């Protein structure tokens, strides 16, 4: 709700810098202050489109209190492996709910493998050097010798990482960021009931 409105600038910064970030949104009734103690799934469109410019990001919704751990883990995996902010939607019922939950073993979860730079990249590293298959830029952690670079909210040149206002470069970078997000695998949609002769389709999330 209003909290996510105030965070949209930081979310947009994570989009253009291509840094991992998980934003947890506990939805409530709106608009404005609205219904601050009541539950409502009001922020889906805001999570998808509520930023300026071309700034796509994945959105995940938790379905129950016990599902929150799995959803948060997958949101973190997507953010870290694809160098993108991810929004995790919950709501008042989920946030205030409870349920029996067995502490999982991390070995049962898929590994998280961030796209860190490698030593052989040092000679030709640029901040937006990308994996040719996934489109994800490689991640140089601050302090790594030989990988000094500058990030920020200004558009950068796709090759050098320097500030650029060139329209062709900006168009390219917008497409590269969008294509990277579009390549993130999405699970198959689960259809319950017989879909062959149905007159009405109900789509739910969370």
Per-range role (PLM):
Residues 1-49, 58-80:
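Thiamine diphosphate
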Residues 49-53, 194-195:
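Short, flexible turn/loop "capping" segments at secondary-structure junctions
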Residues 54-61, 197-200:
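Glycine- and acidic
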Residues 71, 76-206:
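Flexible, low-complexity linker and terminal segments
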Residues 2-4, 42-45, 57-58, 92, ...:
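Flexible, active-site-adjacent loop/turn segments at secondary-structure boundaries
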Residues 27-30, 52-57, 90-92, 117-122:
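Short C-terminal domain-edge/linker segments immediately following a structured domain
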């Amino acid at each position: 709700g209003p909290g996510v409105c105030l965070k949209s600038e930081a979310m947009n910064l994570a989009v253009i810098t291509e840094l991992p970030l998980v934003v947890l949104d506990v939805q409530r009734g709106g608009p404005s202050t609205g219904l601050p103690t009541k539950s409502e799934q009001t922020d889906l469109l805001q999570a998808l489109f509520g930023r300026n410019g071309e700034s796509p990001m994945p959105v995940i919704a938790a379905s129950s209190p016990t599902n929150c751990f799995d959803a948060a883990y997958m949101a973190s995996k997507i953010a870290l492996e694809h160098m993108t902010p991810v929004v995790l939607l919950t709501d008042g019922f989920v946030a205030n709910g409870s349920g029996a939950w067995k502490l999982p073993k991390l070995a049962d979860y898929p590994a998280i493998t961030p796209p860190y730079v490698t030593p052989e990249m040092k000679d030709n590293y640029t901040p937006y050097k990308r994996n040719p298959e996934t489109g994800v830029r490689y991640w140089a952690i601050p302090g790594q010798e030989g990988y000094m670079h500058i990030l920020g909210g200004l558009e950068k040149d796709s090759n050098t990482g320097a500030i650029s206002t060139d329209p062709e470069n900006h168009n390219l970078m917008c497409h590269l960021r969008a294509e990277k997000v579009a390549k993130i695998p999405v699970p198959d949609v689960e259809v319950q009931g017989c879909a062959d002769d149905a007159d009405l389709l109900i789509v739910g999330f969370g």
